[in-house]
Amino acid sequence: MMKSDSVAIDVPESSSVAKRKAPFMANIRDENGGYKKGLAIFDFILRLGAIAAALGAASTMGTSDETLPFFTQFFQFNAGYDDFPTFQFFVIAMAMVAGYLVLSLPFSIVSICRPHAAGPRILLFILDTVALTLNAAAGAAAADIVYLAHNGNQTTNWLAICLQFGDFCREVSGSVVASFASVVILMVLVVMSGLALRRY
């Protein structure tokens, strides 16, 4: 009687079984990529709005000037932003914020094209925080001077000048409002960058 030899045959796993989990993982990555790309597009749009607000604030403050129609032999009554060091700081700070926001646009575009790249997001998160701090400081300082211009201070005998220089006060008040609009947009940008970085 002959002994039968047992032969073990290895059957490779079918390609459909081996790749069964791959589409699921790919779908998760695509969903995250779509979410991050949507955030990046919204980030770019908000940056354009922040640029407009910061430039508007700087240009309005920088061109604010009013001369009263009456004068004496020795005095001419004039009010301009360069009469107040705080307003000069405001113009410089808002110009710096606007310049940074313009330079940040290419990095925002990179985040749109490559939503999974963490480097541009981290850089924008850090620099947006710095710009937000500078913008808020300039806006708060200018708002204090605008308040004094409107209301004065009886304790220190500072008189309100807005009754005489109405146009000047309207211009500087508008520039302060625009600066705080830029602050709000920068706050949203920082929060969005933080949300995007959480998903990396």
UniProtKB/Swiss-Prot annotation:
GO biological process, one term: cell-cell junction assembly
Topological type in the membrane: Multi-pass membrane protein
Transmembrane parts of this sequence: 38-58, 89-109, 122-142, 176-196
Claim: Glycoprotein is one of the keywords in the record: yes
Family: Belongs to the Casparian strip membrane proteins (CASP) family.
Function: Regulates membrane-cell wall junctions and localized cell wall deposition. Required for establishment of the Casparian strip membrane domain (CSD) and the subsequent formation of Casparian strips, a cell wall modification of the root endodermis that determines an apoplastic barrier between the intraorganismal apoplasm and the extraorganismal apoplasm and prevents lateral diffusion.
Known partners and oligomeric status: Homodimer and heterodimers.
The protein's name: Casparian strip membrane protein 2
